[in-house]
């Protein structure tokens, strides 16, 4: 047994070794305190049973890269883009006018219905494989409008169906007016 402290051991270990030993790896660089709290509560609280899986819904912009921890990636660039409406451009998918625009198109509602069905079918299978969280990434061009609106709505739909999860918007506010 060595005389190093735990912190010395951590400092001396290559990051890859620590990552491989970790049961959970959480990238907090784009999380708010509330999002981190919800995720930690979901993963480690006494009320969180190990017979459940935590869906983590992440919106992102393809121009900033796919989230590295994504288990499933869905591309919503086929949906009509609010970016081209000058009134909607400075807003995000968190704003009602953008949400209303995105969801005024039938393909958005149809896509979400199919995605909810798919996730409700897949979650138990991922859980059986020992996963405690499933990162579902929803991407559009810049990560401001379509992906944010869909991720928020998906989070609320799953919650209504009794599936508690977390929603994160990785790229909201990054380069908001450029495409």
In which residue ranges do the predicted regions lie?
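Catalytic cysteine-centered active loop of the rhodanese-like fold, especially the PTP/DSP P-loop
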Residues: 133-155
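Post-Walker A helix-loop "phosphate-sensing" segment adjacent to the P-loop in P-loop NTPases
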Residues: 155-165
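A structural preference for short, hydrophobic beta-strand core positions in alpha/beta folds
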Residues: 167-169
């Amino acid at each position: 047994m060595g005389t190093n402290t735990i912190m010395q051991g951590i400092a001396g270990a290559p990051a890859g070794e620590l990552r491989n030993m970790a049961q959970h790896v959480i990238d907090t660089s784009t999380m708010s305190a509330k999002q981190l709290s919800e995720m930690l509560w979901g993963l480690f609280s006494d009320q969180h049973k190990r017979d459940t899986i935590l869906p983590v819904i992440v919106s992102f912009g393809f121009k900033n890269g796919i989230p590295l921890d994504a288990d499933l990636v869905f591309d919503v660039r086929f949906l009509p883009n609010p970016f081209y409406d000058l009134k909607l451009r400075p807003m995000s998918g968190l704003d009602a006018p953008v949400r209303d625009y995105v969801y005024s198109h039938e393909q958005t509602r149809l896509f979400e219905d199919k995605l909810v069905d798919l996730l409700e079918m897949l979650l138990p299978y991922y859980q059986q494989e020992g996963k405690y969280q499933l990162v579902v990434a929803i991407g559009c061009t810049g990560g401001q409008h379509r992906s944010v609106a869909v991720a928020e709505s998906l989070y609320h739909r799953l919650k209504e169906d009794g599936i508690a999860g977390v929603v994160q918007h990785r790229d909201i506010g990054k380069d908001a007016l450029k495409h």
